[in-house]
């Protein structure tokens, strides 16, 4: 059973953060539960005909948008082990995230009212949502099927004019609908223009042959993956034909494209992970994944050539005690812009243990959060500089950045409460830090949630909470939307929620492994 969707006090808060080692951290407002029982439970009838396994009631990888007192969140609903989920879940709030109502968006055959073009799609992934100044909400996601017919996949756009309660004009973006795996769409993001009414932008990459399936797989050994762009200027009723904005050669691709807009001059910035041929030297290291960006000053008609900011130098995350992997936001950036002065903020996870072979090895994982900033439209960059790293070098991962009133916030997970030799569970916490001087210094670390057991999360190439989490300006502060497992410390062995996540192939007592929560941060 799911819990009521109002403030939920997790054990770490009730126990006074006894397991937290940081002496400067303070407790945050109790998280609010967003997600309830899966609205796609009936879709399990199709699971036996599909590859992989399904984790019912597993919600992961949320995105969110805020406009005044309206907040909208989206997430993967019923995550699958080898890509996507039964569908996309939606929550909307009319009180700034104090309470939530759930609804759905018809992107797969798991919804009763799915349009014919998507009726053969049984999976959805990568939700993104953004709200314009006029209150129109724009969403995008991947809709796909690994088996029928021949790995069909698409970037699908939708809009809402009632704060996320209902969605219409659900449609594949022109030039982003494919019937075979020769072309596979991935990692879409949608951004509403902050000053132009009825205008929004969607970006994604399309992986071109040879590839294996439209799973969200970032490996790039033998195909190409340009960045594509589409826009709407009629409030999401129609979208422009996809155009390439970052062209790529063989064995080169983009992934994690995200647009931010400077409201002072309507300059568009698209940030991406530009992955070049393996073992390409960069500034004294050997990294094939590079943080880069392009920009447009004419509404997306033309774009600059990619400018590389820094190598990602990311190894991913493993449990230091067991070697079991977690799937995290490695090789993906989070981006924000200060609307008052156009300053750009980019955060990502990295590893001080990065080696010249690139490959992760025993005893190596991402252990720091880095920040790069630009105050001149990307002409020059400060950093990357380390803004969070644990003294014991434990994993830290999946950062998210937002700016509000000149104040910068970054959220992240870390494993500071994992003890040497602790193998039965993987204590994980969610945190936020702040900067009031443009990212030069950081402090005021605040505890959001945990410790919870990461090893009870659904498995998708590792224990999975999401490639992204969400953080948005809200009022004078921020709204964080994130995922945690429901196995909180002290991990009682008799607690059904502390068993491994139940799937349709490996049933256990844990039929509700994860949920989506929100927290209002001051």
Predicted regions and their residues:
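C-terminal PAP-associated
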Residues: 27-522
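Secretory targeting and sorting signals
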Residues: 2-27
């Amino acid at each position: 059973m799911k819990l009521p969707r109002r403030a939920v006090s997790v054990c770490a808060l009730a126990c006074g953060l006894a397991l937290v080692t940081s002496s400067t951290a303070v407790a945050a407002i109790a998280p609010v539960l967003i997600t309830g029982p899966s609205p796609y439970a009936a879709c399990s009838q199709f699971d036996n005909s599909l590859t992989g396994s399904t984790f019912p009631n597993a919600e992961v990888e949320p995105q969110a948008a805020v406009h005044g007192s309206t907040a909208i969140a989206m997430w993967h609903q019923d995550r699958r082990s080898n890509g996507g989920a039964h569908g996309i879940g939606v929550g909307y709030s009319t009180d700034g995230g104090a309470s939530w109502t759930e609804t759905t968006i018809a992107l797969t055959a798991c919804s009763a009212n799915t349009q014919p073009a998507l009726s053969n799609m049984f999976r959805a992934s990568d939700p993104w949502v953004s709200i314009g100044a006029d209150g129109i909400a724009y969403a995008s996601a991947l809709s796909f099927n690994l088996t029928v017919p021949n790995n069909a996949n698409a970037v699908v756009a939708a809009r809402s004019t009632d704060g996320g309660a209902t969605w219409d004009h659900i449609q594949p973006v022109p030039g982003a609908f494919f019937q075979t795996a020769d072309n596979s769409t991935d990692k879409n993001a949608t951004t509403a223009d902050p000053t132009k009414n009825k205008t929004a932008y969607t970006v994604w990459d399309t992986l071109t042959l040879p590839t294996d399936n439209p799973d969200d797989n970032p490996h790039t050994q033998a195909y190409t993956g340009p960045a594509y762009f589409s826009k709407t200027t009629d409030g999401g009723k129609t979208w422009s034909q996809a155009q390439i904005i970052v062209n790529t050669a063989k064995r080169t691709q983009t992934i994690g494209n995200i647009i931010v807009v400077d409201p002072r001059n309507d300059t568009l910035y698209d940030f991406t992970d530009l992955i070049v041929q393996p073992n390409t030297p960069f500034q004294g290291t050997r990294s094939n994944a590079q943080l880069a960006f392009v920009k447009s000053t004419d509404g997306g008609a033309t774009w600059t050539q990619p400018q590389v900011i820094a190598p990602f130098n990311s190894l991913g995350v493993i449990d230091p005690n067991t070697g079991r992997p977690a799937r995290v936001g490695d090789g993906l950036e989070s981006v924000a812009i200060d609307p008052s002065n156009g300053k750009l903020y980019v955060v990502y996870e990295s590893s001080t243990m990065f080696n010249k072979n690139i490959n992760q090895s025993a005893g190596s994982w991402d252990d720091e959060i880095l920040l790069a900033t630009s105050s001149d439209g990307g002409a020059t960059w400060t950093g990357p500089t380390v803004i969070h790293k644990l003294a014991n070098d434990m994993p830290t991962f999946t950062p998210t950045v937002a700016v509000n009133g000149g104040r910068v916030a970054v959220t992240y997970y870390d494993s500071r409460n994992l003890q040497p030799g602790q193998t039965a569970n993987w204590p994980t916490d969610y945190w936020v830090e702040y900067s009031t001087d443009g990212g030069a210094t950081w402090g005021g670390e605040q505890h959001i949630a945990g410790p919870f057991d990461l090893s009870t999360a659904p498995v998708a190439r590792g224990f999975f909470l999401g490639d992204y989490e969400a953080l948005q300006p809200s009022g004078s502060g921020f709204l964080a939307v994130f995922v945690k497992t429901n196995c909180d410390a002290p991990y009682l062995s008799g607690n059904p929620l502390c068993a491994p996540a139940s799937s349709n192939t490996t049933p256990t007592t844990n039929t509700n492994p994860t949920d989506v929560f929100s927290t209002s941060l001051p």
